[in-house]
């Protein structure tokens, strides 16, 4: 098991890196009796439990409130923190390994001046310890005696609607795995997943990142996604629920008028953004793709000029994202 591997690594006098890309204590708090859950008033998201600060915090807009003692819905006393964050994992590892130093590395634990330098000193000392952290721990750090990397909850990148999620997951797992065995000592990587037979995970683990990337490219070619089609996303947001969508409907109508229906240009949307409401603003997207970059650029050049003249353009905040890295 993962705990056994951690225990043996510590006994060997080496260091362990535990990776969990989710800060806080737990990603949700719910009532066992009525099902109430703490949600952000400004965003379409749940509030994350930060127990060390006794706060519920939105990781999108930074809205905060105290952790309630009673359920606001039914006044029940059984409020349950669901899921794992770095705080909770740190607490659990401290209980399992009371004689071993456990160091959490995330945006919350490194706020104070000098905190990150202290992490580097601990990691560089070579003394047995457990480093647990988010993505900020995965890149560019050389700790020679880290011989075990444990990745918790690798599944989150497998089921995202963003077509680039598999690519990012492969890059992240490769980066994290690269923290193990960087010195003269051999390294080991444990990946916790509910999908050990997932084809992409099997390729990444069994055949390496190069073959993994080739497989992703083959899938992109089959589904005609970038880089085999050229894409732009027009984003619009407004503090009124329907204005952003209305603006993008007009944008699509104008675009279709500029170019007669053609297999060379495709449209999707307008659709709600993955997080439709963020910081009190409603967000929609219109995706445009073309077989050639020159065709897409010509359309966008004319379309942007037309959109700037729309009256609705003053009531919404809009932008054009060419080759979007996030959907």
Q: What do these predicted regions represent?
A:
Residues 1-245, 249, 253, 257, ...:
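Inter-lobe coupling/hinge segments of SF2-like helicase ATPases
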Residues 128, 289-308:
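Extended, charge-rich low-complexity interaction segments
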